[in-house]
A protein has these predicted regions:
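Conserved beta-strand
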Residues: 7-10, 17-27, 58
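The feature captures the beta-strand-to-loop junction immediately N-terminal to the Walker
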Residues: 32-37
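Helix-to-loop junction immediately C-terminal to a conserved catalytic motif
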Residues: 50
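ABC-family P-loop ATPase nucleotide-binding domains
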Residues: 77, 81-139
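Catalytic Walker B motif of ABC-type/P-loop ATPase nucleotide-binding domains
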Residues: 152-156, 161
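ABC transporter nucleotide-binding domain
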Residues: 170-254
Length: 284
């Protein structure tokens, strides 16, 4: 299977923060959810993949091509990007922006763009300055999907939006990857969105990649033990990934394969899995 993204031992250093040794391969036709706390390095990683920031170690291949190769600038025509803040000129309308974008992308599809404006109920002749946050994100997504991109890089595209708008946008991303030559990397704080949408999950914590796993395999390999304190403390140390202790006992995230058979292990949702994993990392 071809790869949409290949990262090998990628690092980047800033004063007070380091992204260290990030490696993963995203198969073509799949959606990767990138999760982590604020400051974990999600936006830094996306900038490195875009080539907007220069890495200090490792290698990055996008759609089979090295990020710092001579032809990467041309390859960007096949990458759609939506950032947390969509920056279009405030005085331009969506119709005027179409003319700008038409001159930017060689594969620009005006019909697709205006179809998305209609689908998203975006007024073509209203200045961008008068758009709400949700409207701004929708316009950015319309632009990213209108130049035959094979890879979408999305940094918090649903942050701050109401649930109905989020569901509408997630459906668009899901439709995008029905063509198996297309792939998506999406970072989000809203884990429930990623649980619905993604094939793979990558979890960054303080600049380190704690895991990159197929979502379903991750949820099958881990589980939740709800128990009293004594039982929780008796669990094999290698089996426990993180615990939360409350007044009525413990909730422990465990590796199913390492837990004794007589211990009841419940299914765990992705959001609780990540929360307990963060607690476990903080206690190490």
């Amino acid at each position: 299977m071809n790869s949409a993204l290949e990262l090998n031992d990628v690092s980047k250093h800033y004063p007070g923060f380091s992204l260290e040794g990030v490696s993963f391969t995203l198969p073509q036709g799949c959606i990767l959810g990138l999760v982590g706390e604020n400051g974990a390095g999600k936006s830094t990683l996306i900038r490195l993949i875009m080539g907007a920031s220069k890495r200090e170690g490792g290698s990055i291949r996008v759609l089979g091509q090295e990020v710092d190769s001579e032809g990467f600038c041309d390859l960007k025509q096949e990458v759609g990007v939506v950032l947390d803040e969509t920056h279009f000129p405030e005085g331009l309308t969506a119709r005027q922006m179409e003319r700008v974008l038409r001159g930017t992308y060689s594969n620009w599809q005006p019909g697709v763009y205006f179809d998305f404006l209609s689908r998203f109920e975006l007024p073509p002749d209203k200045p961008f300055r008068d758009f709400s946050r949700g409207m701004r994100m929708k316009l950015g997504i319309a632009a990213a999907l209108s130049h035959e991109a094979r890879l979408l890089l999305l940094d918090e595209p649903t942050g701050g939006l109401d649930p109905m708008v989020r569901d509408e946008i997630l459906e668009v991303f899901s439709e995008f990857t029905r063509d198996e030559s297309r792939s998506v990397l999406i970072s989000s704080h809203i884990v429930s969105d990623l649980e619905k949408l993604c094939d793979y999950i990558a979890f960054l914590h303080k600049g380190r990649l704690l895991f990159f796993e197929e979502k379903d395999a991750l949820k099958e390999s881990c589980g939740l033990v709800v128990c009293g304190r004594a039982q929780g403390e008796a669990l094999p140390k290698g089996a426990v990934l993180g615990c939360e202790t409350g007044p009525y006992g413990m909730r422990c995230l465990v590796r199913r394969a390492l837990v004794p058979r007589d211990v009841e292990v419940e299914p765990v949702g992705l959001e609780e899995l990540i929360l307990l994993l963060v607690k476990g990392e903080k206690e190490r």
